[in-house]
């Protein structure tokens, strides 16, 4: 939970994971949580969840794969600021995507990132939508879909 505090600086308090959220997404059947460690200290995590877990989110209506059970949504991806730009995030994402590629019936990975970030991703990436002031952050985000 301490790691998610780093999100507050960029996006606001509501992006800090609560114990309830951690329990829901780290321990829920079907979730794909991965943790990065440096000298036994947790320095980051990534959580993937089936897109269908987000059935209460209005934006899921634009996702053509909703209900097909073939997409893992990247719910959270956080690395402590002092460990960014050192390859830790890249390695964590690589392990995560490698696991997704091995899952039967999972054809896509999707998520929300700040506008322009998905253009740096490798592979077949499609930007589906842009959202101004995403979740009240004051920032424009894009919803992307990656073919695995």
Q: What is the role of each PLM region?
A:
Residues 110-113, 123-142:
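Conserved catalytic-core motifs of GNAT/GCN5-like acyltransferases
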